[in-house]
Amino acid sequence: MQEASGLAPAPLPFQGRAMSLRETAYAKINLALHVRRRRDDGYHELETLFAFVDAGDELTAKPAPADSLRVFGEFGGALDDPFGNIVAKALGTLPHGEGWAVTLEKHLPVAAGLGGGSADAGAVFRMVERSHGLPADWHARAARLGADVPACVESAACIGRGTGTELEPIPNDLAGTPVLLVNPRIPLATGPVFKAWDGVDRGALEGATAREVAFAGRNDLEAPALSLVPEIGAVLVTLRQTGGWLTRMSGSGATCFALYDTPEQRDLAQAAMPPSWWTLGGALR
């Protein structure tokens, strides 16, 4: 693994049957998302500024005779196929010695533009890194699970190109920025949003730091997502009235975010949101 990844440099194997590992699957947001073109293979060429919130799902792993996965939490019921879950797939793609009993506490909404499943897989990669070390081809293994997974393994601000798997570092002058996530509790699958994109290339990312790129950027999937879930518009309008300096939709939606100058501004904004909406307040990593 690259030295700049921020992951633990030395393996920390299970020490006895009672030891457990715990990782947060940090919520992913796209501070900017520029879709450049449709590719012949059906995917899209894009440029995005990944950022991560200091909160998300929680995963725990304990030694067990065989791998297993238990899911609970507010959004656990949305994952009705544990064997098809990306956490189970991440376990299956990585050598990790004895079996692991993994518990996933699902706090992030599903199909929400937050990379929830990819973040969960990224947390598994970090747990395996701590306990056994990752194979040299970990990035390729992560990319096979999903376009956002390599970035979620690192869980640090970066630029993503190609389908999002080609990562580049960027000076992160947004770490610690107060952020509020809001979702109208309407799932929105990625495929239909990309299909509704108008195909117009509106240009590349611009800027030398995370703040500059975010401020100058846009989300090209916002308009197609709005055409499918008009309630996103109400979320954006409400957030823009709360004094944040940047409000935008994340990923393919329907979650939107606002960035603030102070935690007090963020907390007041969160308290002003309709109780029927899902919210999460935190800070950028």
Curated annotation (Swiss-Prot):
Pathway: Isoprenoid biosynthesis; isopentenyl diphosphate biosynthesis via DXP pathway; isopentenyl diphosphate from 1-deoxy-D-xylulose 5-phosphate: step 3/6. Keywords: ATP-binding, Isoprene biosynthesis, Kinase, Nucleotide-binding, Transferase. SUPFAM superfamilies: GHMP Kinase, C-terminal domain, Ribosomal protein S5 domain 2-like. It catalyses: 4-CDP-2-C-methyl-D-erythritol + ATP = 4-CDP-2-C-methyl-D-erythritol 2-phosphate + ADP + H(+). Its EC number is 2.7.1.148. GO terms for molecular function: 4-(cytidine 5'-diphospho)-2-C-methyl-D-erythritol kinase activity; ATP binding. ATP binds at P109, V110, A111, A112, G113, L114, G115, G116, G117, S118, A119. It comes from the Bacteria. Disulfide bonds: none annotated. The active site is at K28, D148. One of its GO terms (biological process) is terpenoid biosynthetic process. Pfam families: GHMP_kinases_C, GHMP_kinases_N. Catalyzes the phosphorylation of the position 2 hydroxy group of 4-diphosphocytidyl-2C-methyl-D-erythritol. PANTHER family: 4-DIPHOSPHOCYTIDYL-2-C-METHYL-D-ERYTHRITOL KINASE, CHLOROPLASTIC. Belongs to the GHMP kinase family. IspE subfamily. HAMAP family: IspE. This is 4-diphosphocytidyl-2-C-methyl-D-erythritol kinase. It comes from Novosphingobium aromaticivorans (strain ATCC 700278 / DSM 12444 / CCUG 56034 / CIP 105152 / NBRC 16084 / F199). The lineage of its organism: Bacteria, Pseudomonadati, Pseudomonadota, Alphaproteobacteria, Sphingomonadales.
